[in-house]
Amino acid sequence: MKIWLSGIYEFFLRYKNIWVEVWKIRKELDHPNRKKDESEFLPAHLELIETPVSKKPRLIAYLIMLFLAVAIVLASVSKVEIVATAPGKLTFSGRSKEIKPIENTIVQEIFVKDGQFVEKGQLLVSLTALGSDADIKKTITSLSLAKLENYRYQTLLTAIEKESLPVIDLSNTEFKDSSEEDRLRIKHLIEEQYTTWQKQKTQKTLAYKRKDAEKQTISAYVRKYEGATRIEQEKLKDFRKLYQQKSLSKHELLSQENKAIEAQNELAVYRSKLNELESDLLNVKEELELITQFFKSDVLEKLKQHIENERQLQLELEKNNQRRQASMIRAPVSGTVQQLKIHTIGGVVTTAETLMIIVPEDDVLEATALIQNKDIGFVAAGQEVIIKVETFPYTRYGYITGRIKHISPDAIEQPNLGLVFNATVSIDKQALSSPDGHKIELGLGMTITAEIKTGERSVMSYLLSPLEESVTESLRER
């Protein structure tokens, strides 16, 4: 082992001594310094060997290396913005009002034109639904009849409770929508029903009186035969005493017993008739009371039905009136009419179809941008946005700045972009400046491109990211 180490030591020591000796005579080994014209007269191979190399290529190489070093330093230090690009358009803020009908209707009259300023509550357009006027007229007629029927049964109920003639007064304004014919008909019905009820009561009252008279007559006979029976019984007792004393014949005793039995039988017959009449009187009295009860119950039931019918008809009339009012479309706010889509009288508009948009006086433009799925993870509310309007080249007219105001939590499907997220961007100004200094107002629906600043990165990382991605992906291959 020592021999091997000493051999290595001798080897390096030898070359060290050689290098030291050569270094001592290094100047003697150089070619003599010759002038340019002296070198030109030397043989070609000596001229090539002894002519010094030009310093320009070396200087250029140094400059290139210096430039590369500066470029690497700047690329490592300098930062560039990370931008997410999203297409979109200019829209008004949520204060703009879309005017839509509530049902399929026909345009009756148009009172405004595109670009016109309207006040709140001003009539914009008059629509009419098929059959709406007929429905209202029919409901009013039915409601007036229902009110008359209610009055009819209410009047009858009052007459029943007070047991007096019904007081009929149909001159009230409540019945102004009903015809004279209907009012007369109701009046006659009230009188007829009340008269019929009174006739039924009168008939039963007369029947009761007849039965009561019969009762009085039978009661008299009962009292008569009660007295006759007592007398005949007393006489029978006396006849039996006389018969026992042999002062009276048996034939006379039997004759008296027969008279007593006949008196008792007559008394029993009339008592039976009296009981029957009392039962009939109770029945007639109950029937008399039932006539009033049934009539009152029927009146109450009919009154309840017609009150409910009137309530339903009143709701139906309110519904039809609301339907008519809804067809008279008025401005919900003061503002400017835009995107008017109806121009033909008699044209048909469908449910929820946008007829026009009312832009309030203080409304402002906003931008809506469609952020792609690949960028949504880096976009957040409050980030700065540069908005370029495609109508006006930004190199000549400039651009608009703004900030992300809101991002929808759910994606929507777009035919060309796939699933995207809708973002609202507030803009700092509502106009651009032309090259000659004129102010150009921005308009609703203009297409824009939103460049959202999501962060910063160094130029070096930007340049090396493709290489890093390629290396990473290549290392994953089998």
UniProtKB/Swiss-Prot annotation:
Q: What does this protein do?
A: Involved in the transport of the Leukotoxin.
Query: How does the record classify its membrane topology?
Result: Single-pass membrane protein
Origin species = Pasteurella haemolytica-like sp. (strain 5943B)
Family as reported in the entry's similarity comment? Belongs to the membrane fusion protein (MFP) (TC 8.A.1) family.
Name this polypeptide is given = Leukotoxin secretion protein D
Q: Which gene encodes it?
A: lktD
Q: Main localization of the protein?
A: membrane
Which PROSITE patterns did the record assign? HLYD_FAMILY
Topological region Cytoplasmic? 1-77
